[in-house]
Amino acid sequence: MEGIIFDFNGTLIFDDPINMISWKKYAKRKFNYDLTDEEYYKYNGTPGETWIEGITKGKITGKEATKCREEKEEQYREDLSNAEIDLIKGAKEFFNELKKNNIPFTIATSADKENIELFFKKFNLNQWFDLSKCAYNDGTFKGKPNPDIYLIAAKKLGVDIKKCVVFEDTKSGVKSGYSAGAKVIGMIAGRNPEDIWKFEKVVDVINDFTEVNIEKLNQLFK
């Protein structure tokens, strides 16, 4: 194993309840649209523009959809800033283990720059991660489920994506990871483990980061 790449939302923090509320608030305020739980999970893990196009039945696309996504993310940042939430159990200890063993690791998230900057501030991520090596939605590449974001993250780390482990919690994220060539582990994130095992090509499923270690991950490549 040469490196590890983490998705963020739903993988390093369980923020589904916060993000769901943010999307429902925004959809109602902006479009007078009542977003259902089923729709939330349908779009979860995809770029915000995909949500907007779906909510508006394709009436809003392109730059206008990007503007709407940015407005929604302002709502999310406000909601997250006010929430009492921490990194998933075992994450900090796992980061420390990776640092101690000089294993490169980074984040690949569909979130935009403002969001990842908030994540770094709220969760003190600077002690483990280099922001310049994180991949996030800057509008220059296709979002998940396309493989681009994980290929970019691996390149920033200077590692071979085919020798990386990716941690993901959504169907589109898992597809992005394995399409790039990585081994993908599914994060349960409070859901039924059987639902995560249904995601194509996951090599393992975990509840939190107390269930993984370097030795176990290295076995995936033998």
Model-derived segments and their meaning:
Residues 32-33, 103, 159, 182:
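Short glycine/serine/threonine/alanine-rich loop segments
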Residues 2-93, 97-101:
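N-terminal helical cap/lid subdomain that shapes the substrate entry/recognition surface
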